[in-house]
């Protein structure tokens, strides 16, 4: 057996009973030499270079093996190839298997090995955990070939963590049989019969109606049910599911147990809520404008899997994959305890996310990269999401060759050290094992796991689509292919578990159940209310908080936040800045600037029992070095969070620097707040200009979710916005877009002019949380105004007064002929100009709340000005941007023909701002001068 050794210099390397361990280490060495000790690196390099002779020493009489180094090396290479590339030959395609070329060597013969040779080599050569299981290497390799080339394909060699990789290798290679008894197999078949029977019934009785059938990946439903069972075993009682439209109706029906009557009612356009279970176990919210049935979610409380679990399917727009970070945020909210001082305590066993992706959309949509990047970050981790790709190997009409540049749709997950299993959707019991492995891995390592459920799509993209127009060859084969219901049913018949008659009876029973459900529905009970009015709770704008504070109370809070541990060393330069926060309480001339107003607001909010969570790029310090919510010891780098030491704190405060992402982070915070409505979630953009990277979140969730789905959110956005000569990409948060989205009191949009109004606004928003009146808050937050003394206010403006939608400057109202309205920095620029150039004929008003537009408040001002001639709107943005186009109809209605109405601002522009700072100053001065002209 040593015929290849003639050119090899032999070295006496004999590992004896430790051979299996050493070969496992050698396997690690082949992947990453630095993963083993230095002395083993030297030894293994001699083996790799053909300089050593490795022999297994007999550990018991008559057993053991020896082989030349050439044979050992070939065995090792074969084993390594099977582990790394066996997935390329795995039996994971139910139909239309791809033709693969230029494959790595994966067969015994390709390594000049044979059965006889391998039968004389110990099984330990393959892996040490085989030594007590198989008699020799041939049996062990046979096992590995069946395992790695079977109905589950395994990819884990890309994982850098050696402990995780070793765990997966042992779990995969150790002989395992899913503990599925015949009763459970019957139940699996019954589930599949209901899954497919549901689709067949709808297909027959509602011809052409869109339902985005699950057929082809039907096993998704029993996989989800088994996941819930495994989660219950380790007492995970909150499951958050996110998915797009494909198969959604089936999941709603068979996982969330939405009654057939409700689902069929939606197809018949009758009122489904009449069939909502009376026990309250199923929560289905609805907005006043509504949404299509395959976007709707729900929440089911059930004890079907051993413990009481809350199973949520998130509402979802048509924008594929965009719900993923929302689900992650909802899960983290379910895991966080926020009802105590300090930062939240997180328990990964409280909740778990399941995200169901499409094979075309998973690599195609960047939101998946952003979301997976959150998975191991302290502020965002959920202890592992289960990702299931419902891989029907087509995206509408686009096949994989045109849809991605990778072998598998799951390849993007490799960059995040995530294990990947590909499983044949027609092998029911293999899909159950895939779930077992995933759940065991999550329990052990608290990390994400990806399962690629490889199937097909029985019909077109929707039920009106003819797929053979663009994909004739695949669909020729699909039409001839039996469904998994038939395949698994026949297998149970063949195994003697059920008879053919029993199989047919189960399938017939489903159709009878569906028909009985439809018979309960009154066809004449049509939904025909076109008014679709918003609820009473949204008839009024955000209401001020009426709570008053004493100066002593605010001083106590302020002092606590400026008191550090004795051994904590604040950077001296920063300490001087922070110490100035004592001045408002110690000096008549002391003013509370923007950052201090925010700190005081947050402190009083957590004292009221509302938790605060602030995230964004650089939010701990603040983009403009103003917040300093987390301090760093200048000597050792330790951190200290002043807001964790507020006296009488009843809820948590946390702040996190986010990854350089907008869409996923906004989606996460939105989801967190939807799940925990008593949490004040704030996302802060580095600059407001970058917020449009999350535009889908604003359009499809934040502004419209309540109207579509009845889903309440009180998410707050801080979007730094002001024209300060920094160019077109560091000036505008696109205020106009948020105003365009504003309707039906769905949000509050502000551009503030004072720190005290900011304080009262934050408290008003916090007060609304958890109520029917809660809604998103969009703040055009300041940049240079953060340190502006005109914006800063004395402490007595913080003790009472509440939020003011408008702020009217002092003036002799009898002399006023011109009313100038502005907001944010534009207002401050005008105020500072008029302070230097007084003019009694001009009255300046800060419109701090742009939406809902303060018509009533402005009308009161107009009525108090007997000699008024002109009303002017002044803004820094171009005429086609900013607030002008939004406020114009309101102002026109207010002034009528009684007063002149004028606009002052930049002319219409394609880009928001000038690129040159000096030109910016000229334009800004022109706006100011024109607005105060007689």
Swiss-Prot record:
It comes from the Bacteria. Keywords: Glycolysis, Oxidoreductase, Thiamine pyrophosphate. Residues 515-537 have a biased composition (Basic and acidic residues). One of its GO terms (cellular component) is oxoglutarate dehydrogenase complex. It catalyses: N(6)-[(R)-lipoyl]-L-lysyl-[protein] + 2-oxoglutarate + H(+) = N(6)-[(R)-S(8)-succinyldihydrolipoyl]-L-lysyl-[protein] + CO2. Coiled coil: none annotated. It is an enzyme of class 1 (oxidoreductase). Residues 515-544 are annotated as: Disordered. GO terms for biological process: glycolytic process; tricarboxylic acid cycle. One of its GO terms (molecular function) is oxoglutarate dehydrogenase (succinyl-transferring) activity. Its EC number is 1.2.4.2. Transmembrane segments: none annotated. Its cofactor is thiamine diphosphate. E1 component of the 2-oxoglutarate dehydrogenase (OGDH) complex which catalyzes the decarboxylation of 2-oxoglutarate, the first step in the conversion of 2-oxoglutarate to succinyl-CoA and CO(2). PANTHER family: 2-OXOADIPATE DEHYDROGENASE COMPLEX COMPONENT E1 (PTHR23152:SF4), 2-OXOGLUTARATE DEHYDROGENASE (PTHR23152). Homodimer. Part of the 2-oxoglutarate dehydrogenase (OGDH) complex composed of E1 (2-oxoglutarate dehydrogenase), E2 (dihydrolipoamide succinyltransferase) and E3 (dihydrolipoamide dehydrogenase); the complex contains multiple copies of the three enzymatic components (E1, E2 and E3). Belongs to the alpha-ketoglutarate dehydrogenase family. HAMAP family: SucA_OdhA (MF_01169). This is 2-oxoglutarate dehydrogenase E1 component. The gene is odhA.
């Amino acid at each position: 057996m040593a015929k290849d050794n003639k050119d090899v210099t032999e070295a006496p390397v004999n590992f004896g009973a430790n051979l299996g361990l050493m070969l496992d280490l050698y396997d690690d060495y082949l992947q990453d030499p630095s993963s083993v000790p230095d002395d083993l690196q030297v030894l293994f390099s001699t083996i790799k270079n053909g300089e050593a002779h490795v022999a297994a020493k007999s550990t018991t009489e008559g057993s053991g093996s020896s082989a030349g180094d050439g044979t050992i090396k070939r065995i090792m290479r074969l084993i390594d190839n099977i582990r790394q590339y066996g997935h390329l030959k795995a039996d994971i395609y139910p139909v239309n298997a791809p033709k693969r070329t230029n494959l790595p060597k994966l067969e015994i013969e390709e390594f000049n090995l044979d059965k006889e040779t391998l039968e004389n080599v110990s099984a330990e050569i393959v892996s040490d955990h085989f030594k007590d299981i198989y008699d020799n290497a041939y049996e062990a390799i046979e096992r590995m070939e069946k395992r790695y080339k079977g109905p589950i394909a395994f990819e884990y060699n890309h994982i850098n963590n050696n402990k995780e990789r070793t765990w997966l290798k042992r779990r995969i290679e150790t002989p395992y049989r899913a503990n599925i008894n015949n009763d459970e197999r019957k139940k699996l078949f019954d589930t599949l019969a209901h899954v497919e029977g549901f689709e067949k019934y709808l297909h027959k009785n509602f011809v052409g109606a869109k339902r985005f059938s699950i057929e082809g990946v039907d096993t998704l439903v029993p996989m989800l049910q088994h996941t819930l069972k495994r989660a219950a075993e380790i007492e995970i009682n909150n499951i958050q599911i996110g998915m797009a439209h494909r198969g959604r109706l089936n999941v709603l029906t068979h996982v969330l147990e939405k009654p057939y009557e409700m689902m069929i009612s939606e197809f018949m356009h009758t009122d489904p809520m009449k069939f909502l279970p009376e026990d309250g176990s199923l929560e289905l919210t609805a907005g006043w404008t509504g949404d299509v049935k395959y976007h709707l979610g729900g929440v089911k409380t059930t004890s079907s899997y051993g413990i009481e679990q809350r199973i949520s399917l998130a509402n979802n727009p048509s924008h594929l994959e965009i719900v993923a970070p929302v689900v992650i945020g909802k899960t983290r909210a379910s895991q966080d305890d926020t009802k105590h001082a300090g930062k939240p305590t997180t328990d990964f066993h409280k909740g778990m996310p399941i995200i169901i992706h499409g094979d075309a959309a998973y690599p195609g949509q960047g939101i998946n990269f952003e979301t997976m990047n959150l998975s191991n970050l302290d502020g965002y981790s959920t202890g592992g999401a289960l990702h299931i790709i419902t891989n029907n190997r087509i995206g509408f009409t686009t096949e994989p060759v045109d849809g991605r540049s990778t072998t598998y749709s799951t390849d993007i997950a490799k960059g995040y050290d995530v294990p990947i299993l590909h499983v044949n959707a027609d092998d029911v019991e293999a899909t159950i094992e895939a779930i077992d492995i995933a759940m065991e891995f999550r329990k052990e390592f608290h990390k994400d796991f990806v399962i690629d459920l490889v199937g097909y799509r029985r019909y077109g993209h929707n039920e009106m689509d003819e797929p053979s127009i663009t994909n004739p060859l695949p669909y020729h084969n699909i039409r001839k292919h039996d469904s998994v219901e038939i395949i698994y049913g026949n297998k149970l018949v063949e195994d003697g578990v059920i008879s053919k008659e029993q199989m047919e009876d189960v399938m017939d029973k489903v159709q009878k159940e569906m028909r009985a459900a439809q018979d309960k529905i009154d066809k004449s009970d049509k939904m025909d209310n076109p008014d679709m009015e918003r609820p009473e709770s949204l008839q009024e704008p955000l209401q001020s908080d009426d709570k008053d504070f004493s100066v002593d109370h605010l001083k106590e809070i302020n002092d606590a936040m400026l008191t550090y541990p004795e051994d904590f060393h604040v950077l001296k330069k920063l300490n001087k800045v922070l110490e100035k926060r004592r001045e408002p309480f110690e000096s008549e001339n002391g003013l509370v600037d923007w950052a201090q107003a925010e700190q005081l607001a947050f402190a009083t909010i957590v004292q009221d029992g509302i938790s605060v969570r602030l995230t964004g790029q650089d939010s701990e310090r603040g983009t403009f070095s103003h917040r300093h919510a987390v301090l760093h010891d200048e000597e050792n780098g330790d951190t200290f969070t002043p807001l964790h030491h507020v006296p009488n704190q009843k809820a948590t405060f946390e702040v996190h620097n986010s990854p350089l992402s907008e869409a996923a982070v906004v989606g996460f915070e939105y989801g967190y707040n939807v799940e925990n409505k008593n949490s004040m979630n704030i996302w802060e953009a580095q600059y407001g200009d970058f917020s449009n990277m999350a535009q889908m979140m604003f359009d499809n969730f934040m502004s419209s979710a309540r109207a579509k789905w009845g889903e309440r959110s009180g998410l707050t956005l801080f979007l730094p916005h002001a024209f300060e000569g920094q160019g077109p990409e560091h000036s505008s948060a696109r205020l106009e877009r948020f105003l365009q989205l504003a309707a039906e009191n769905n949000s509050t949009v502000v551009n503030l002019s004072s720190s005290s109004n900011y304080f009262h606004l934050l408290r008003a928003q916090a007060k609304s949380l958890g109520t029917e009146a809660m809604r998103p808050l969009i703040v055009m937050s300041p940049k240079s105004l953060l340190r502006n003394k005109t914006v800063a206010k004395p402490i007595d403006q913080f003790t009472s007064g509440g939020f003011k939608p408008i702020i009217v400057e002092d003036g002799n109202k009898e002399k006023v002929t011109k009313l100038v309205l502005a907001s944010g920095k534009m207002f401050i620029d005008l105020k500072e100009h008029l302070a230097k150039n007084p003019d009694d004929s001009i009255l300046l008003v800060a419109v701090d709340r742009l939406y809902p537009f303060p018509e009533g408040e402005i009308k009161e001002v107009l009525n108090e000005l007997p000699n008024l001639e002109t009303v002017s709107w002044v803004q820094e943005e171009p005429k086609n941007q900013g607030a002008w186009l939004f406020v114009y109809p309101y102002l026109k209605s207010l002034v009528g023909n009684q007063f002149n109405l004028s606009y002052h601002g930049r002319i219409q522009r394609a880009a928001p701002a000038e690129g040159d700072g000096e030109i910016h100053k000229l334009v800004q001065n022109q706006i100011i001068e024109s607005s105060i002209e007689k």
